[in-house]
Amino acid sequence: MYDIVIRVPENEPVTGQLGNGIYIVGSGADSHIQLDADGISPRHCQLTVEDGGIKVMDLGSNTGTYLDGERLGVGAKEVLPGDEIRIG
């Protein structure tokens, strides 16, 4: 299990845990992690959680997905402990 903290502007942070699996993050009703904020696409990014760690991949969002301040390109990137993912 991996601990996560989700911060949406003008809202209190939400904490949770992710087990192995694939999670879609976005504003759409079918997203596993649903966020209601400006600049978030219905299917914004994907988190893949495995025993070896977490990977993040942008799903063609309009405003991008960032890992420690760098906009993601094509493909998945490994997320290390303490890294920050920003969407929108």
Enumerate the predicted regions with their spans.
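Forkhead-associated
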Residues: 2-8, 12-88
